[in-house]
From Swiss-Prot:
Origin: domain of life: Bacteria
Catalytic machinery residues: C121
Function: Required for formate dehydrogenase (FDH) activity. Acts as a sulfur carrier protein that transfers sulfur from IscS to the molybdenum cofactor prior to its insertion into FDH.
Lineage summary: Bacteria, Pseudomonadati, Pseudomonadota, Gammaproteobacteria, Enterobacterales
Encoding gene, per UniProt annotation: fdhD
Protein name per Swiss-Prot or TrEMBL: Sulfur carrier protein FdhD
Gene3D superfamilies: 3.10.20.10, Cytidine Deaminase, domain 2 (3.40.140.10)
């Protein structure tokens, strides 16, 4: 497979993720108008010529999605395990063609599964229930986060959703410094995909997962917790609620899980010792 530089891949996926369509408003069904709707396309991740997963996603920043998914699913251990990547059109969507190291590809073949995902679904098509959970090393306790800094971050999360501002149809995942500043984020029609894009980008840039937290605009499902923990994230803030399985996984892997995050409000589900509130 042809090896492609990162900047070349970005040119392939330089898509807005928005399409204009004709629609009707409730108060005027006689006169159509033009409005923006978020794009959702099938994206296949193909490792060394073998299709591994098809996800429904926004057609942008797919190189970060592929890297983040590969890391958060345990397919690779570091970005160095990927030798090349191409984003190419396919008959019904897009393919991300990934060249893996031989060692990682052999491991992938041993645990290969075929997924046909709903929007951002990370478990559709697993071969048996035992395949759902992945062993995650317990996270260290290396930081303390002041909850008073959360409110400012919540007010700025929408800044990372330009498509969402136009369409009302995307989730966001952003990295939050201990100061409350958001220093990078991604959006997608799928919440898991938005998170994978963030994980992929920070890993590609060699950023540390300590001294900060992930903030997501969605609920906290177990996949969100597991993906975060697989990459070394110690604290996950979610705007909506957490599921019981998410709480169980977070407790087991030492991740601090916080839901119902609104200005002046937060519900801590696990490991509050990382949090400060004066």
């Amino acid at each position: 497979m042809k090896k492609t530089q990162q900047k070349e891949i970005k040119n392939v996926t330089n898509i807005t993720g928005v399409r204009q369509i004709e629609l009707w408003r409730r108060d005027d069904l006689q006169h159509p108008r033009i409005d923006e709707v978020a794009e959702e396309v099938p994206v296949a991740l193909v490792y060394n010529g073998i299709s591994h997963v098809v996800m429904m996603a926004s057609p942008k920043d797919l190189e970060y999605f592929a890297l983040g998914f590969s890391l958060s699913e345990g397919i690779i251990e570091s970005p160095r395990d990927i030798f090349g990547m191409d984003v190419v059109p396919s008959c019904n969507g897009l393919e991300v063609q990934i060249e893996l190291s031989s060692r990682r590809f052999m491991g992938l073949k041993e645990r290969r599964r075929a997924l046909a995902g709903r929007t951002g679904c990370g478990v559709c098509g697993v071969e048996q229930l035992n395949d759902i959970g992945k062993p995650v090393q317990p996270l260290p306790f290396t930081q303390a986060f002041d909850l008073n800094k959360l409110d400012d971050a919540l007010r700025h999360l929408n800044d990372f959703q330009p498509v969402g501002q136009l369409t009302g149809c995307t989730h966001a995942a952003a990295w939050m410094l201990p100061s409350g500043e958001l220093v990078g984020g991604h959006e997608d029609v799928g919440r898991h995909v938005a998170l994978d894009k963030l994980l992929g980008r920070r890993s590609q840039e060699g950023e540390s997962w300590q001294q900060g937290a992930v903030l997501v605009s969605s609920r906290a499902s177990y996949e969100m917790v597991q993906k975060s923990a697989m990459c070394g994230v110690e604290i996950l803030f979610a705007v909506s609620a957490a599921t019981t399985l998410a709480v169980e996984v977070a407790e087991r892997c030492n991740l601090t899980l916080v839901g119902f995050c609104k200005p002046g409000r937060a519900t801590v589900y696990t490991h509050p010792q990382r949090l400060i509130h004066n």
